[in-house]
Amino acid sequence: MKRPRPTSQPSISSTVKPPLSPPVTPILKQKLHRTGTPKWFPLKLTHTELTLPLTFPTGQTFRWKKTGAIQYSGTIGPHLVSLRQRPGDDAVSYCVHCSTSPKSAELALLDFLNAEISLAELWSDFSKKDPRFGELARHLRGARVLRQDPLECLIQFLCSSNNNIARITKMVDFVSSLGLHLGDIDGFEFHQFPSLDRLSRVSEEEFRKAGFGYRAKYITGTVNALQAKPGGGNEWLLSLRKVELQEAVAALCTLPGVGPKVAACIALFSLDQHSAIPVDTHVWQIATNYLLPDLAGAKLTPKLHGRVAEAFVSKYGEYAGWAQTLLFIAELPAQKTLLQSFSQPINKLDESAEVNETSCDTLKP
């Protein structure tokens, strides 16, 4: 499903914390409006279409923070927003803390959440194809795939290489701090993601001093490569929403530090490539257990990445990436406790079992 991107918001630079070099004075093309007492409004998504703990802390994005019992806050362009769910409330609520326009913030939020895609319809389709998926979905409703800004998603997953979630989050927080400060919530600072121009003024050495290690050269190399693209790097990334998955992945893999797995993550979480399947050793193990038993015991090679992705697409169709996202979430420790209460065991299920366990583990736990 390919959709046009809403009109882009202006890039805004900001003050940078030492030891990074100071940016130029930011120029705001639109006035930011900050609210006083938070006002909450119902979002056009029920809890069965969006469950916050099954969407945000699951490895899709590392820029959203838990700021309440069931509340998450983050930025989308120049908009600082919060989402919350309360026991007994069917609808998810949202609050705009800072924005160029409250109406624009709502539209940007719905776009970010892929709100036009019905989980109920997808889950019904997947369950018909795989009854075991239906059992998982019954317990893990509301796990959505996000539609992030491609540059933001790309930089985040460059930080994810051979890394753990805590360290990735620290790196992403550092990159985010290069953008305009939009506000503080529950002790967390929130910034608009920095522009390509702002990122280009940070050297590899400065990223290394900030603890990025070898990833520093990938970030600076990718930023330079994007800036050299005819028409601009942001436009080039957005153009990958309009091409076939193979072409998008191949294009992303020309960037420093981007391999097939990272490219698939970026494609799935920001480029409308809903059939993208990030493949690593964890996904390989699950695939050989349940989808490709003839390859059990074989070593994962670049050539076999395609076979794994094809197996998921063959099973679940053009939105296979959404199915794999839920199956990955089922692997998270917080969810395993719930799933172990099922009448059917989770591990080593045969073809007649009603519950399946599959992983889209793009990160080290």
Curated annotation (Swiss-Prot):
Residues that bind 8-oxoguanine: P278, D280, Q324, F328
Catalytic activity: 2'-deoxyribonucleotide-(2'-deoxyribose 5'-phosphate)-2'-deoxyribonucleotide-DNA = a 3'-end 2'-deoxyribonucleotide-(2,3-dehydro-2,3-deoxyribose 5'-phosphate)-DNA + a 5'-end 5'-phospho-2'-deoxyribonucleoside-DNA + H(+)
The protein, known as: N-glycosylase/DNA lyase OGG1
Short name of one Pfam family: HhH-GPD
Tissues of expression: Expressed in stems, roots, rosette and cauline leaves, flowers and seeds.
Encoding gene per record: OGG1
Protein family membership: Belongs to the type-1 OGG1 family.
Residue stretches of biased makeup (Polar residues): 1-16
Source species, domain of life: Eukaryota
Cellular localization per UniProt: Nucleus
Effect of a null allele: No visible phenotype under normal growth conditions or UV-A irradiation stress.
Molecular functions (GO terms): class I DNA-(apurinic or apyrimidinic site) endonuclease activity; damaged DNA binding; oxidized purine nucleobase lesion DNA N-glycosylase activity
Signal peptide: none
Any GO BP: DNA repair
GO cellular component: nucleus
Listed SMART domains: ENDO3c (SM00478)
This protein's UniProt keywords: DNA damage, DNA repair, DNA-binding, Glycosidase, Hydrolase, Lyase, Multifunctional enzyme, Nucleus
Known EC number: 3.2.2.-, 4.2.99.18
Region spans: Disordered: 1-24
Binding site for DNA: N162, R167, R215, H282
Catalytic residue positions: K261
Note: Transgenic seeds over-expressing OGG1 exhibit enhanced seed longevity associated with reduced DNA damage, enhanced seed tolerance to abiotic stresses and improved germination performance under abiotic stresses.
InterPro entries: DNA_glycosylase, HhH-GPD_domain, HhH_base_excis_C, OGG_N, Oxidative_DNA_repair_enzyme
Function summary: Involved in repair of DNA damaged by oxidation by incising DNA at 8-oxoG residues. Excises 7,8-dihydro-8-oxoguanine and 2,6-diamino-4-hydroxy-5-N-methylformamidopyrimidine (Fapy) from damaged DNA. Has a beta-lyase activity that nicks DNA 3' to the lesion.
